[in-house]
Amino acid sequence: TVTTILPDAASQEIIAGRLPILNTDKLFLKRGEKIHFIDKAINMEQKTVKEFRHVGGSTPGLFEGTRWSSGRGRTVEHTELVQHRGILYITNQRIVFQATEWGFDKTYRYLTAITPYSNACEMQFGNKSYCMVVADGSVVNQVLQLIKQRRQIP
C-alpha cells in the first residue's frame, strides 16, 4: 500500500474535473510546464530469475583430496515482482517517475494506453509498460484524461 502526499484539496479539484497547479522544487520544469499531480508511487517490475538446481550426490574419491560426483542439473525460471519506490509527477507536458532505480521521464506523444485500477495505473509507452501502484488509481487516470482533453483542443 502507498500513503498519499497529494493534498486533499488537489484531489477534490481533480475529481471535480479541474486540474490543480502544484509547486515543488524537486522537478526542473520546462517553459510553460505546470505540475498537476504529485504523489508517492511504486513502479512494479516483473523480473525473471533463473536458478540452477543440481540433483545428485558425491562420494569420497579413491585418492586423498578427490571427490567423485554424479547427478544432473537443470535451470529453473520463475518471475518475481520487484518494487521500486519513488515520486510520480504528472505535468501538462510529461509524466516523470523520480526514483533511485527504474525512474522515467516520458512525454505524452509516446503514451499509448492507460489502464486504471483502484490502487494502481498501468501506462504503456510504445512496447514498454509501467505498472504504478498509487494511493488512488482513479485520480491518476482522471488527471491523465483531463490533460488529454486539454491537449486535443486546438
Q: What does each of the following model-derived ranges do?
A:
Residues 5-6, 27, 37, 42-58, ...:
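Acidic, Ser/Thr- and proline-rich intrinsically disordered linker/docking segments
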Residues 21, 36, 60-61, 65, ...:
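Intrinsically disordered, low-complexity, compositionally biased regions/tails
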